[in-house]
């Protein structure tokens, strides 16, 4: 598969390297686990590498047949200049060109492959971490003329047409947070202030972290700096300028700023679909509520994947693309 146009920020990702954080390696991995797992379920390739597309997608020419699914909340995609559905397993023939256009709802989507991308793992993962230059395509985003190879696999045509309806997130801009490790280094007034104002995501935000801009600055009881310590995903650091930073997948493994809060797992899933200049608000939840929230998410995800495996949803218009193409040619010759 050859990259004709790379898109804004397209990287190879899988579930990441969380078990190597203790050794100083950033987690990396997909920003949205739900969309990632649904995408791989549609093409019957659990835990396989995907292309994570941010805002504006790539144009890719396939040099061998495959089945693909691009999963996102809303975008336009084309195969040989013809529109095709998102969130659906599509058969792509040798020589065909897939064009993923701008994502119109949300910020990220995932292109999954029935025949896996053939990339050598580093520390049990192929996930790209651009700051350290490891994983994926030599530790960088996709570039024009890059060639990605697939592993050998007999194509299972039965999965063509697998489809799934992705529901919009409820309260997509309301981010649940729990008390952070240095919660007590801030006054109760500051705790209230954090959830009583809205924040804008700065343009200086990326996979490492989202910098936020709010009207009222958060004040520390004593100092912003602490002795460096491990950083959990979703940690909300407050540096000396009083504007919070939410640390995400490509974060460093240790840091020396006070952490007023930690974004819940569901909150991080929401953040993955937000972009610069979007507004968010926080809401405090308990650790127990966060656990229930996560268990509900897992149960729903497992149900959704089971439904896909049982072929509960099928787009009949995409089951026999070759037959449709031949029929169209015959019809053209008869006219």
Each PLM stretch: what is its role?
Residues 1-335:
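Conserved "landmark" site that anchors the functional core of diverse proteins
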């Amino acid at each position: 598969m050859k990259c004709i146009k790379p898109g804004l920020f397209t990287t190879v990702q899988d579930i990441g390297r969380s078990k190597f954080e203790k050794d100083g390696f950033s987690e990396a991995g997909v920003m949205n686990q739900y969309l990632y797992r649904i995408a791989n379920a549609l093409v019957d390739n659990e835990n396989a590498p995907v292309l994570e597309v941010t805002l504006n997608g790539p144009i890719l020419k396939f040099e061998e047949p495959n089945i693909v699914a691009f999963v996102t909340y809303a975008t336009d995609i084309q195969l040989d200049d013809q529109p095709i559905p998102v969130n659906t397993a599509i058969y792509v023939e040798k020589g065909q060109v897939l064009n993923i256009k701008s994502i119109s709802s949300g910020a990220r989507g995932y292109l999954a492959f029935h025949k896996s991308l053939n990339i050598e793992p580093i520390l049990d993962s192929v996930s790209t971490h651009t700051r350290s230059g490891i994983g994926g395509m030599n530790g960088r985003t996709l570039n024009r003329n890059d060639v990605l190879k697939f592993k050998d696999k007999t194509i299972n045509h039965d999965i063509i047409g697998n489809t799934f309806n992705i529901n919009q997130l409820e309260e997509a801009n309301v981010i649940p947070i729990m008390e952070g490790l240095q919660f007590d280094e801030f006054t109760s007034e500051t705790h209230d202030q954090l959830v009583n104002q809205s924040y804008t995501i700065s343009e200086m935000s990326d996979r490492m972290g989202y910098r936020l801009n709010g009207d009222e600055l958060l004040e520390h009881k004593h100092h912003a700096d602490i002795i460096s310590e491990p950083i959990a995903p979703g940690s909300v650091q407050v540096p000396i300028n009083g504007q919070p930073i939410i640390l995400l997948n490509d974060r460093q493994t240790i840091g020396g700023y006070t952490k007023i809060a930690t974004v819940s797992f569901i909150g991080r899933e929401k953040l993955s679909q937000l972009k610069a200049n979007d507004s968010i608000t926080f809401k405090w939840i308990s650790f127990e509520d966060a656990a229930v929230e996560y268990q509900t998410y897992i149960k729903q995800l497992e149900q959704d994947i089971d439904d896909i495996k049982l072929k509960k949803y099928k787009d009949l218009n995409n089951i026999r693309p070759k037959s449709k193409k031949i029929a169209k040619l015959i019809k053209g010759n008869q006219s």
